[in-house]
Regions:
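Membrane-anchoring alpha-helices and their flanking helix-loop junctions
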Residues: 1-86, 101-162
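Membrane-interface loop-to-helix entry segments
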Residues: 91-103
């Protein structure tokens, strides 16, 4: 059941989202600014009407949906910040939703509009999120203690290999 009296509590917000909304906002602003830069300086784009682009877009979109649904089933929102999930997708990466934002959002937008520059934005987004997620991980260490520290040493942040 939805607990409306705690809905606007900063503690509730931090437990559910933490750096997600500001990070997503920063990522979308970077994508927007990159597209504006391309338009202002008439930077060459690639053709988007080719079948290989459509197939690649579809496959990456399916992968994104797979990750998001697997995340939801690995740790339902009601358990976030209350229970450390180390199974499911969380046994491969610690921040699957942020992985989607960093990689899939940029790549899918690039494929949609034919932007080379958006592909170069991926490492920048990766560094941005790596810095931002430190605060969330400190928060999680405060909740779960040594269990989360051990989890951090065994599972990488965004990419399923160390």
């Amino acid at each position: 059941m939805l607990d409306l009296k705690n809905w606007f509590s900063p503690k509730h917000y931090k437990r559910l989202w933490n750096v997600g909304p500001p990070g997503l906002t920063a990522s979308l602003i970077l994508i927007y600014l990159t597209l504006q830069y391309e338009a202002a300086f008439s930077i060459k784009k690639y053709e988007t009407g080719h079948m290989w682009v459509d197939v690649l877009f579809f496959l990456i979109f399916l992968e994104m949906l797979f990750i998001l649904f697997w995340t939801l089933f690995s740790l339902p929102p009601k358990n976030r910040g209350r229970k450390l999930s180390t199974g499911g997708i969380y046994s491969f990466i610690r921040h699957p939703i942020y992985t989607v934002v960093i990689f899939h959002t940029n790549i899918l937008t690039s494929l949609w509009v034919g932007s080379y520059l958006l592909l170069f934005l991926v490492p920048i987004q990766y560094l941005l999120w790596s810095k931002m997620v430190v605060k969330e991980e400190e928060y999680l260490i405060g909740i779960f203690g040594q269990e989360y520290i051990d989890y951090m040493s065994n599972v990488s942040r965004f990419i399923p290999w160390k």
